[in-house]
Structure formats: C-alpha cells, structure tokens
Amino acid sequence: MATRRRTLLKVIVLGDSGVGKTSLMNQYVHKKFSMQYKATIGADFVTKELQIGEKLVTLQIWDTAGQERFQSLGAAFYRGADCCALVYDVNVLRSFDNLETWHEEFLKQASPSDPKTFPFIVLGNKIDVDGGSSRVVSDKKAADWCASNGNIPYFETSAKDDFNVDEAFLTIAKTALANEHEQDIYFQGIPDAVTENEPKGGGCAC
C-alpha cells in the first residue's frame, strides 16, 4: 500500500518587534503564553503537523526579527515560502501603518512567481489589552487595508487568551496548501522554464 505523502509548507510571520509574533506561534504550537518579552534575534522556526482533508501537512512557521537591522536576512529566509502572515498590534498604530512596508519587503525579498496572487494573511493581535480600551486600529480600518491589497484574509487574535489563534493558522495552512497546489500545476505546465530563465553565461541550456 502506498505511503501518503507528507506536505511541507513554509510560512513566514512578519511584523514590527513586540506585536506578538513569537507569542502567537508558541500559543499555536505549544499552547503556552509568557508575559515576558524576549526579542527574536535573526530568525527561528517551529513546526506543527495537521490533517487537511486527505493530506497530512507539516507547517514550518518562520519567526523573523522585526528590527530593521535584520531585514537583510530576508532573501534567504523568505524564498520558498507558501504563505506570509503579517502581524500588527491593534493598540499600536505604527505597527499597522508598517504593514505596507512588510508586505512590499516580503515580495521584494521572496520574489514569488506571481506577486499579485501570492497568499498573505493579516493578524490584528493583542485585542485583549485593557479589555479593548487601548485599541487604536479599528477592525474596519484593517479590513479596508486587506480589501485594497487583494482581499487578504483578516483575523483579530489574542495570543494571551488563545482567541482565534487556531482558526487563523488553519486558514494559513489551507491558503498555503492551495498556493503549493497551484505552483505544482504551474511548473508542470512549463517544463522548460528553468532553462529559459538561465542567466547569461550561466551554462548550457541544451
């Protein structure tokens, strides 16, 4: 009997420092939350297996530092991604305003075959803070931004309260899986694409 193929999906989580990227990942994978803040240095990843329909999927979720000095690490870590999650803090306007920068940075570094259709998801995190009274970014403002950038799926989350975390990452997994499937079809249809894109002087294309 044939062994079922395990699908590995690479997901990149981006956003300003302190928006809760690591906390969301730890809550999703380990069901743990810590009030202590520890900045991510460079990049790290966690994995989680889940079943989507008939397929066994391993999510490889990359946590990258939000500090500008680490953005140069991007190209190596972003390439090969199947989905990108953009995270902001609903209580910090700057983190929301910077979504545009992170969105552009990812597309620039990852160089997906079709930037217009590459799947993103937006997470508005920390909705639990002060019972919501500290909030400065409305759900409408976030939804409008997502709509104007290709109808990106949007979730409001709380890593602390474990609110919408599983739902958000399940959508990420399904979106990444759909993108991987489309890529498979795309590459099967153009078997000569590699030789056509060979840099000049880079070898024989025969």
From Swiss-Prot:
GO terms for cellular component: plasma membrane. GO terms for molecular function: GTP binding; GTPase activity. One of its GO terms (biological process) is protein transport. Keywords: Cell membrane, GTP-binding, Lipoprotein, Membrane, Methylation, Nucleotide-binding, Prenylation, Protein transport, Transport. The modification Cysteine methyl ester is found at C206. It is a lipid-anchor. A lipid is attached at C204, C206 (S-geranylgeranyl cysteine). It is found in: Cell membrane. GTP binds at residues 15-22, 63-67, 125-128, 158-159. Its main location: membrane. A motif (Effector region) lies at residues 37-45. Intracellular vesicle trafficking and protein transport. Belongs to the small GTPase superfamily. Rab family. This is Ras-related protein RABG3a.
